[in-house]
Amino acid sequence: MLQPKRTKFRKQQKLRNRGLAYRGNKVSFGEFGLQATSRGRITARQIEAGRRAISRHIKRGGKIWIRIFPDKPITQKPLEVRMGKGKGSVEYWVAQIQPGRVLYEITGVKEELAREAFARAAAKMPVQTTFVEKQVM
């Protein structure tokens, strides 16, 4: 699963997830992309589940790019522990997603196959998504 090799600090504050994605909002590497239309947090497990769904559907053809990375640690206290005594330990990692962010990209497959593969990946995502194509100038 995806997570940073090392970080400056083990734990982070919650912070807000506002605004639109001004970076990473265009299809850069592939021909087709899966773009988020709502905001949320995607865990490393969900990113991997989406990647597997896409790669199983396209079989051997095509190339996949994952355009997001889970770099935010989420902490949790154990069950039945009283409040206080410090912040809990890191349980999992998430990527914060703003509307407009491209999650996955694909190339080397037909558009219909790409649409079906992204539909399967979208079913595993906690955010609403849409299919986008590369803009040719």
Curated annotation (Swiss-Prot):
> What lineage does UniProt assign to this protein's organism?
Bacteria, Pseudomonadati, Pseudomonadota, Gammaproteobacteria, Thiotrichales
Family, per the entry? Belongs to the universal ribosomal protein uL16 family.
The protein's name is Large ribosomal subunit protein uL16
Family matches, as InterPro entries: Ribosomal_uL16, Ribosomal_uL16_bact-type, Ribosomal_uL16_CS, Ribosomal_uL16_dom, Ribosomal_uL16_sf
What are the GO cellular component annotations?
cytosolic large ribosomal subunit
Q: Which domain of life is it from?
A: Bacteria
Function noted in UniProt: Binds 23S rRNA and is also seen to make contacts with the A and possibly P site tRNAs.
- Tell me the subunit arrangement: Part of the 50S ribosomal subunit.
Keywords, in A-Z order: Ribonucleoprotein, Ribosomal protein, RNA-binding, rRNA-binding, tRNA-binding
Give GO BP annotations, semicolon-separated: translation
The record's annotation in CDD domains points to: Ribosomal_L16_L10e (cd01433)
Q: Does Ribosomal protein show up as a keyword for this record?
A: yes
> Which Gene Ontology molecular function entries are recorded, alphabetically?
rRNA binding; structural constituent of ribosome; tRNA binding
